[in-house]
Amino acid sequence: MMSRGDNMKVLVAMDEFNGILSSYDANRFVEEAVDSQIEDADIVQVPLFNGRHELLNSVFMWKSGTQYRIDVHDAEMNEIEAQYGQTEDGLTVIQAEQFQKGTGHYLNHTSYGLGEVIQHALNKGAKTFAISVGGTDTFDGGAGMLQALGAVFYDDDGERVDMTKGLGQVKHIRRVDTSGLHPQLKDAHFQILIDFSSKMYGKQSAIMQSYKTLHLSREEAVEIDNLLWYFSEIMKHELKLSLGQIERGGAGGGMAAIFKTIFNAEIMTSHELVDQITGLENLVKQADLILFGEGINERDHVINTSSLRIAELAQQYQKVAIALCGTSEKFEQYENLGVTAMFNAFDEMPTEYPDFKLGVTLRAYTVQVVKLLNAHI
């Protein structure tokens, strides 16, 4: 067991493993291993999150506050219980992926439920929001959300178009009235978390990049993409908004572009919010050893994840940093950033695997890593 004159400061910052193991649980297994090998180690865990998962739980591991459970609607307008939180320092945290789910055709899915959650928070005085919109089952360009917040869509005959019925209704829209939007929105500040690069429509749209993993045909994806283009044209004509060129605007099926253009939202990566909430850079600066990693299996359109940010900071402050990952997909990037050593549990990250078994594997790798370091310190 390693022993030092001063307590060794160890930073443990594991991201999730493809929905199998949460950031919190991955951290716990790694911490157990460190604790078994380094006497009196001063271990700090940083629960991470990304633009799809882990946001709510991770934030409330660092901050105190109140979590609410409210009845809203899922992507298919079925009643569902949603959970969101408000921290004591005024940050409202919403993880849209928790309740914006559906099993039917994406043309019939709506983002109305997210609007309901935002409305509930606004009614409780919320002014600052952090919202992750990735991983939802909606591609309605945020139209359902806008309707829940007070916007009205009209057809040629002046009749209302009901966007709770999904993107398929977009083709009927001719006029948009936002005068009835919730009055508190004008004072609200939104931070939208996105770790994946996509536009609202076109070759780089979210739907065109992901339709195969969503089990859609290319023809179905093109139909959705064309409707999103039409919706953006309506919004340009009616509200003078340019949705198509917003960087990362395709997240949440186009919700990110709406947040940016209508509500002047700040689009940010998850690691930027991690920095903001946890003081990650200072924790890296103080650490003697950093153990980090992830099992996020997203090949084509990853912008950045917190693990890459940690590697950058470790290089900046010349720290010993060990990556414990589900796969080797980011190893070249880690290598370029000077990560000390890298280990992967799988050749390809599985979609199903016993969580405890994965945790034990991480713990075993960590024990061996620390033993190697112990032999050279």
Question: Which positions does each model-derived feature cover?
Answer:
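N-terminal loops that bind phosphate or other acidic moieties
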Residues: G5-V133, D137-I377
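Methionine residue identity
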Residues: M1-M2
